[in-house]
Amino acid sequence: PRHILGKGKLTELEILALQGQASLIIFDGELTPAQLNSLSEVTERKVLDRTQLILDIFAQRATTRAGKLQVEMAQLKYTQPRLVGKNRAMDRLMGGIGGRGPGETKLETDRRRIRERIAKIKKELDGLRQQRAFTRARRARQGLPVAALVGYTNAGKSTLLNALTRSEVLAEDKLFATLDPTTRRLRFPEEHELVLADTVGFIRNLPKELTEAFQATLEELEAADLLLHVADASHPELDRQIAAVDGILADMELNEVPRILILNKWDRLEDEMRDILRDRWPDALPISAETRDGLNALSRCIENTIHWETTANIEITGPMPKVY
């Protein structure tokens, strides 16, 4: 309970850390504040758990105002119960009328400041949520259906968005490159058009702090008429990643929304592996967003799945990219 590991494994961990000259130890799981402190004392190294690692990655990726607010909110919620201190700075500060009374400890002051900062960020995120709700309402009045790209992180959602709409959204081969939802209009040859939304990538056992902080972003999925589930066909844990995304969508009560499974990065597979995946996922669409292979079949599938309303009252501003 105190160290997660038994004495033997703890000794083995210390030896491995010495041999590898490691200054940081990461546990693939969530540790309690007491366990983090105990492990840091025993190993004399910085210890991170899985949630803190994901939050650190998010902090590096956040560039927009909304993204930074959401990451800061998640970090504060994670940090709040883990505030500890044992030095003279934690002595009670003078407080009360005329300097009498116990006052607050520094620890209590830090916790109060965190609570105040969380309340302020919540207010700002509520403002962003209202702005996005207004945008969604305007799209609904125009009769534009919405298709949202969902999937495990680094599955190629942003690359697919760029390929379909000829945009230049940031798309990199790394985890959580996209934090904020990006929307683009997509016009089909039959004069139909829809809004295509790119969202933050999922990960198995998504930390609850992230789910709460990114609620404003994930609301884009709730307004979607179609979910395009993009999966990395070349990843060795494809099945687990698809199951993780399905589980998160089920938790968000989005099972009723029509969904298309897309096996991206098909060009990286050998013929034998392609046959295996076709048998395992017969309804999935194999594509390569990078080489644009399979995009015609995807566009036809989207057109057949979306319930198109009359486009007579849709106001079209400027030339729109087409799907070829």
Segment roles from a protein language model:
Residues 130-132, 136-145, 163-195, 203-216, ...:
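Switch I (effector-binding) loop of TRAFAC-class P-loop GTPase G-domains
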Residues 77, 81-155, 161-162, 166, ...:
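C-terminal-of-GTPase-core extension/linker across diverse P-loop GTPases
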Residues 1-146:
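Conserved P-loop NTPase architecture
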Residues 2-3, 61-65, 106, 168-170, ...:
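Flexible beta-alpha connector loops of hexameric P-loop NTPases
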Residues 51-55, 175-176, 289-292:
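Short, acidic/turn-prone active-site loops that include or flank metal/cofactor-
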